[in-house]
A protein has these predicted regions:
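C-terminal motif of bacterial Sec signal peptides marking the signal peptidase cleavage site
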Residues: 17-18
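Sec-dependent N-terminal signal peptides
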Residues: 6-14
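Catalytic glycan-binding domains that act on GlcNAc-containing polysaccharides
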Residues: 21-192, 198
Length: 199
């Protein structure tokens, strides 16, 4: 019985590890989805639901967390040595803050959504970018301006020109978005084929 429980625990831990581990090559969209096939299914569903291209979803997650499900902002330090509080409540793949995540759950009815879930994170990104399209009239294909709104918020977007650091980040997202788009063109047909695999 004890041995059975140990084997069961090991199996469950292996499942959790496989589901949550960071992909080996986060710079390649085909590699990501080859390793994490169900991520492709989740991203495809979010694209169909919200209209947000898969390559933009990946580019935002790449910038925000580099696909680390437990990512958090680094703690501030007092006198550059003593660890202090974190600058925001950002967490998970999308680095959504608590307030915006709460709004997402209320708007979508996805009340059990978790910021540590890839499925919920890409749905959140789809929801957010779709609202950005409605509020700020920014096309879902405009990765540069979509990320500016994602980072600065709908209210803070108008002041982005005063923040060169954010502009540079948005350019990186735009470049990554273009790279992911080109990469996925080479493997989208194989990804769209049904697969009956666990991960």
């Amino acid at each position: 019985m004890i041995r059975y429980k140990i084997l069961l625990l090991s199996f469950l831990l292996s499942i959790i590890s496989a589901c949550s581990s960071v992909p080996k090559n986060t710079a390649d969209g085909c590699s990501i989805f080859s390793e994490k096939y169900f991520w492709y299914k989740h991203s495809k569903k979010a694209e169909k639901k919200w209209g947000t291209p898969i390559y933009l979803q990946l580019a935002i997650i790449k910038m925000e967390s580099d696909f680390d499900w437990l990512a958090k902002p680094q703690r501030q330090k007092i006198f550059k040595v003593i660890p202090y509080k974190r600058p925001s409540s950002s967490f998970g793949y999308s680095q959504a803050v608590k307030g915006t995540w709460k709004q997402y759950k209320e708007d979508t009815g996805n009340k059990f959504a978790s910021r540590a879930s890839y499925k919920d994170s890409v749905d959140f990104i789809g929801w957010y970018t779709n609202k950005t399209k409605s509020i700020l009239k920014i096309p879902l294909t405009d990765a540069f301006r979509q990320y500016l709104a994602y980072h600065e918020g709908w209210g803070g977007y108008k002041n982005y020109k005063n923040n060169q650091k954010v502009i540079l980040l948005a350019k990186k997202v735009e470049n990554n978005s273009n790279k992911y788009k080109k990469q996925l063109e080479d493997c989208i047909s194989s990804l769209s084929t049904k697969r009956y695999i666990l991960f």
